Amino acid sequence: MKISRRKFFVKTLQGTALLAVTPALSTFLESCNTVTNPNSPQANLPRLSGTEANGTLTVNIDPNSALAKSGNAAIIGYSKGTLLVDHPSDTTYNVLSSICTHQQCSIDSFDSSSGEFICYCHGSRFDVNGAVRQGPAISPLAKYSSQFANNQLIIRI
């Protein structure tokens, strides 16, 4: 079977274009991956745990706790995942879902200078109340009610 010069040239260009696009396509598809590495170099939040009972999660905040000092933030693990906690003032704590509303990546970083939680999957940023400061996320993080008393943070889960 004989192939024309024109057909040969077209097929060669198509093959070359496919080879050129494949790495870019691979990078694009990988950027949409929803799994994150909790030990990524960007992860900077300390991880704490608490005790679950009757729809609440109780976290002891002793003087050595990562959340003892105002301005700090942490990740608190529990049976259904993790929560983000920010401590903006002496008795105030903000508790948010750690799941980014863009593509459900885990948020594990906090920029204390800007007061923002950062999702390194796609660059979304959220303030300490969960509002979107920078997309691509368009919805705020889910908020959990909490109260602080007797050195314990009690979160409704």
Predicted regions and their residues:
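N-terminal secretory signal peptides and thylakoid transit peptides that target proteins
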Residues: 1-23, 27-37
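Processing junctions and N-termini across compartments
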Residues: 26, 94, 113-115
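Extracellular secreted precursors and ectodomains with disulfide-bonded cysteine-rich loops/domains
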Residues: 30, 98, 103, 117-119
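N-terminal pre-ligand scaffold of iron-sulfur
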Residues: 35-110, 143-157
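Iron-sulfur (Fe-S) cluster-binding segments and ferredoxin-like electron-carrier domains
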Residues: 107-112, 125-131
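Short cysteine/histidine-rich metal-coordination sites, predominantly Zn2+-binding motifs
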Residues: 114-122, 133-142
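Extracellular/periplasmic metallocenter environments
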Residues: 120, 125, 129, 154
